[in-house]
UniProtKB/Swiss-Prot annotation:
<dbReference type="InterPro" id="IPR008991">
    <property type="entry name" value="Translation_prot_SH3-like_sf"/>
</dbReference>
<keyword id="KW-0687">Ribonucleoprotein</keyword>
<dbReference type="InterPro" id="IPR038657">
    <property type="entry name" value="Ribosomal_bL19_sf"/>
</dbReference>
<protein>
    <recommendedName>
        <fullName>Large ribosomal subunit protein bL19</fullName>
    </recommendedName>
</protein>
<dbReference type="InterPro" id="IPR018257">
    <property type="entry name" value="Ribosomal_bL19_CS"/>
</dbReference>
<dbReference type="GO" id="GO:0006412">
    <property type="term" value="P:translation"/>
</dbReference>
<keyword id="KW-0689">Ribosomal protein</keyword>
<comment type="similarity">
    <text>Belongs to the bacterial ribosomal protein bL19 family.</text>
</comment>
<comment type="function">
    <text>This protein is located at the 30S-50S ribosomal subunit interface and may play a role in the structure and function of the aminoacyl-tRNA binding site.</text>
</comment>
<dbReference type="Pfam" id="PF01245">
    <property type="entry name" value="Ribosomal_L19"/>
</dbReference>
<dbReference type="InterPro" id="IPR001857">
    <property type="entry name" value="Ribosomal_bL19"/>
</dbReference>
<dbReference type="GO" id="GO:0022625">
    <property type="term" value="C:cytosolic large ribosomal subunit"/>
</dbReference>
<dbReference type="GO" id="GO:0003735">
    <property type="term" value="F:structural constituent of ribosome"/>
</dbReference>
Amino acid sequence: MNIIKKIEGEHLRFDLPKFKSGDTVKVHLRIVEGEKERIQVFQGNVIRIHRGTTGGTFTVRKVSDGVGVERVFPLHSPFIDRVEMVTEGRVRRSRLYYLRELKGKAARIKPKNRF
């Protein structure tokens, strides 16, 4: 069992910011096309986080041209260049699946009040 934890520990990333459900993030992905490499940015609301060792994931949702797009990212993926926090949201749930049914202004997440 210790051997597995040791191997998993080598692949963990500690450079990601602390974010939670409801936060708006920009995920910078490293895309390799043939011999070229480029960075693609995906910005949206975090609707789910599954924290685990190397199998942890988070789901980001955005609305593009009126169509909802959700993408699941592995937390410790080497293809994630960086994750930027845009805003912190104030929500009372850890899974924000109800946002899928809402449209327009109702689908907004209130910003967190900082005093």
